[in-house]
């Protein structure tokens, strides 16, 4: 006795629903496999993208206390016309305001690019516990590249450092930004010469 088989074509709605479920399942699995450091560095990268959108050097930063982001910052130096408008300084100021204390001893900073001397000094002064860095800065970095101000024995506070978290993603964003900037300048020069 044979039962006739009937093929039922899935509806468009059913396919869309399956695709959405698959998308969220993949996103959930990616989050599960992500370390805490990667999770918070992703948040810093989102801040850096805000700077990128303003045509600023894409540097982003978050400060975490008790497994919660308490402050965020991104580079706005050109936008504000202010040398002090670095991502790290913005985040430190916000974190101090949020905690009601300039001492951020139980906080960790996640930053997409190795801090400069000014920001490294502020990190030490704020008594930050740890700094997690995405990409190193061989020209101006002061967490080991040019100097290591964060761990100088002569200072009354040293900061724990973790380097290279999502380094490729952070580096790619920075190199892409500078490539676009060079291309714009080249195009502008060529247009000026042809005018």
Can you describe what each PLM-predicted range is?
Residues 4-9, 18, 27:
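Short amphipathic, helix-prone segments within low-complexity/disordered or flexible regions
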Residues 59-64:
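Short beta-strand scaffold segments in enzyme catalytic cores
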Residues 24, 28-54, 102, 118-195:
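Zinc-dependent deaminase
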Residues 92-122:
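Helix-adjacent hinge/juxtasegments
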Residues 79-89:
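A short, polar/charged loop-to-alpha-helix boundary motif
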């Amino acid at each position: 006795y044979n039962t006739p088989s009937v093929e039922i074509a899935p509806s468009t709605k059913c396919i869309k629903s399956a695709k959405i479920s698959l998308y969220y399942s993949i996103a959930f699995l990616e989050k599960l496999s992500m370390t805490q450091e990667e999770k918070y560095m992703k948040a810093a990268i989102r801040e850096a993208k805000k700077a990128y959108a303003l045509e600023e050097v894409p540097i982003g930063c978050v400060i975490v206390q008790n497994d919660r982001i308490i402050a965020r910052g991104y580079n706005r130096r050109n936008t504000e016309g202010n040398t002090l408008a670095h991502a790290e300084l913005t985040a430190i100021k916000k974190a101090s305001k949020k905690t009601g204390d300039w001492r951020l001893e139980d906080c960790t900073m996640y930053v997409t690019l190795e801090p400069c001397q000014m920001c490294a000094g502020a990190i030490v002064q704020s008594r930050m516990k740890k700094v997690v860095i995405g990409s190193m800065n061989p020209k101006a970095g002061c967490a080991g590249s040019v100097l290591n101000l964060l761990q100088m024995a002569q200072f009354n506070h040293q900061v724990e450092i973790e380097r290279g978290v999502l380094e490729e993603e952070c580096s790619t964003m920075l190199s892409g930004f500078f490539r676009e900037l060079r291309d714009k300048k080249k195009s502008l020069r060529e247009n000026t010469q042809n005018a």
